[in-house]
């Protein structure tokens, strides 16, 4: 029990030493006073200062003139330079913005037309001109979409593959496709595999009597064959 009491006495002594260590008379904190700051002292923290000019809330800034000690209070600007927001200040929270109903293109103060028919010109919410590439797409896989001096151009593409054993078509959805038709090509062949052209849409045989490869359309159950495989739906040309 005696050991516990002695330990408590030592602990209290250390506490008193740690938190009562500053001698305010010796520190003479008031000698550090300026026209904008007043210094004080406690035995716990020593010297500390208080600013003469302080902001009353989060919507104002306070500044002190070091020469005169006069305080100047200014209002904080909450303008985010976005014409499509209304900007406010709450004394306890500071700046905040609320979206409004506006058309940045109407608010824009400058002409953003770059006279390029292949760009879409607009003014953003920060009053800055932007030019994005014109998206020329008619949704038709059978046309080549380009942009020129007159704007968007849509040119029909050729699906001719120069293969006498295919009929060439174009689907607005898939683009070009080539359906095998019955035909014969005079090429040397000894077995059927000699006629293999790696076309998944055709079948073939080797006619040994004529040394020709005979080709036929693959049976897809009435569905078209596109990109070397049977489709599961109809094709609109």
UniProtKB/Swiss-Prot annotation:
Glycosylation sites: 28, 65, 70, 153, 207
Cys-rich CT-type repeats, residues: 57-81, 82-105, 116-139, 140-162, 163-186
Signal peptide: 1-20
Induction notes from the record: By starvation. Repressed by cAMP.
GO MF annotation terms: enzyme inhibitor activity
Keyword annotations of the record: Developmental protein, Glycoprotein, Repeat, Signal, Stress response
UniProt record, GO biological process: slug development involved in sorocarp development; socially cooperative development
Name of the protein described by the UniProt record: Cyclic nucleotide phosphodiesterase inhibitor
């Amino acid at each position: 029990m005696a050991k516990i009491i002695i330990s408590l006495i030592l602990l209290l002594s250390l506490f008193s030493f740690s938190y009562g260590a500053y001698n305010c008379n010796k520190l003479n904190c008031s000698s550090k006073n300026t026209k904008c700051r007043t210094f004080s002292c406690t035995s716990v923290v020593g010297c500390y200062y208080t600013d003469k000019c302080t902001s009353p809330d989060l919507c104002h800034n306070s500044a002190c003139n070091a020469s005169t000690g006069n305080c100047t209070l200014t209002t904080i600007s909450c303008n985010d330079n976005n014409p499509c927001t209304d900007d406010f200040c709450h004394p306890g929270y500071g700046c905040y913005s609320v979206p409004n109903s506006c058309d940045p293109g109407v608010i824009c103060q400058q002409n953003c037309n770059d006279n390029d028919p292949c760009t879409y010109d607009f003014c953003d919410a920060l009053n800055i001109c932007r030019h994005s590439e014109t998206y020329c797409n008619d949704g038709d896989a059978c046309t080549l979409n380009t942009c020129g001096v007159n704007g968007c151009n849509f040119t029909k593409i050729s699906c001719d593959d120069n293969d006498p054993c295919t009929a060439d078509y174009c689907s607005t959805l898939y683009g070009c496709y080539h359906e095998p038709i019955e035909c014969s090509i005079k090429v040397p062949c000894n077995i059927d595999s000699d006629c293999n052209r790696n076309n998944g849409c055709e079948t073939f045989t080797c006619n040994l009597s004529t040394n020709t490869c005979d080709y036929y359309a693959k049976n897809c159950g009435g569905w078209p064959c596109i990109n070397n495989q049977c489709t599961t739906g109809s094709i609109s040309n």
